[in-house]
Amino acid sequence: VMSEERYLTFALGKGRLAKKTLELFEQIGITCDEMKDKDTRKLIFVNEEYKLRFFLAKGPDVPTYVEYGAADIGVVGKDTILEENRNVYEVLDLGFGKCRMCVCGPASAGELLKHHERIRVASKYPNIAREYFYNKKHQTVDIIKLNGSVELGPLVELSDVIVDIVETGSTLKENGLEVLEEVCPLSARMIVNPVSMQMEADRIRKLVGAIREQLKIQP
């Protein structure tokens, strides 16, 4: 019967998330040694025993692969899920990659957030920023999309504040910025294609259950 099964395909966000996810899979008995080969040119990796396929993708693309069913399951940061806003089910908080999405700026900008002034907000996450200011705070803002070094925004007076991921806050401190408001907590999540969720309900439920148990026993 095993050979009749189709492969369950996973899209993993490249980098630390993928590494952590694969470690987690190993703990529940799912190995994929090919993926550990640093020199490999392969794009898709297979575990024949459990009929699983894995591929690595850029974080922001993971929800796209999952929405279109090119991957049944994805592992990606909550920031990406919120920003990309794809039609996927979020089934599990994996608990690693913990950080926060925050509004940051110089201390003086705190006042601008209180009085609903029209301010400029720089962010790699324009959708998250828009959702937060327009729908949660009901504050009209101009959102400026940047692709990196967002901390520069307030320093060169491109923006009053930024919306960005904060882990330790040391980069902010070095640049005379601070967390002014917290938008939401973030961590790695497992997402599933809605059709796969129905068609492969048992396999996916078993997998999610096994991972959930494993996460419970971790320190």
PLM-predicted stretches and their roles:
Residues 2-219:
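Domain-level signature for soluble enzymes in the chorismate/prephenate branch of the shikimate pathway
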